[in-house]
């Protein structure tokens, strides 16, 4: 068995699966970039006094990331529930 299907000549690649995987990677990249921008803006001063994060900045970033993922998960569950209640034709 080869990694990523390399060397498998008998199996075709489904373009729809590739498109879905690319869309998922793009979505995760967007979430990560928004998370970094949001938490950096909230927790880190624009004037850097030290090369490393201070304890306060580190704690703030940790809490910010945690809250961001909690909110994202809650919103996803809410949207999924609404989608099940009101299916589109």
From Swiss-Prot:
Entry's Gene Ontology BP terms: protein insertion into mitochondrial inner membrane
Name recorded for this polypeptide: Mitochondrial import inner membrane translocase subunit tim10
Function according to Swiss-Prot or TrEMBL: Mitochondrial intermembrane chaperone that participates in the import and insertion of multi-pass transmembrane proteins into the mitochondrial inner membrane. Also required for the transfer of beta-barrel precursors from the TOM complex to the sorting and assembly machinery (SAM complex) of the outer membrane. Acts as a chaperone-like protein that protects the hydrophobic precursors from aggregation and guide them through the mitochondrial intermembrane space.
Family: Belongs to the small Tim family.
Motif (Twin CX3C motif): 39-64
Disulfide bonds: 39-64, 43-60
Molecular functions per Gene Ontology: metal ion binding
Lineage: Eukaryota, Fungi, Dikarya, Ascomycota, Taphrinomycotina
InterPro entries to which the protein is assigned, alphabetical: Tim10-like, Tim10-like_dom_sf
Membrane topology: Peripheral membrane protein
Gene3D superfamilies: Mitochondrial import inner membrane translocase subunit tim13 like domains (1.10.287.810)
Binding partners and assembly: Heterohexamer; composed of 3 copies of TIM9 and 3 copies of TIM10, named soluble 70 kDa complex. Associates directly with the TIM22 complex, whose core is composed of TIM22 and TIM54. Interacts with the transmembrane regions of multi-pass transmembrane proteins in transit.
Keywords: Chaperone, Disulfide bond, Membrane, Metal-binding, Mitochondrion, Mitochondrion inner membrane, Protein transport, Translocation, Transport, Zinc
Chief localisation class: mitochondrion
Cell compartment(s), UniProt: Mitochondrion inner membrane
TM region(s), chain numbering: none
Source organism (scientific name): Schizosaccharomyces pombe (strain 972 / ATCC 24843)
SUPFAM superfamilies assigned to the protein according to its UniProt record, in alphabetical order: Tim10-like
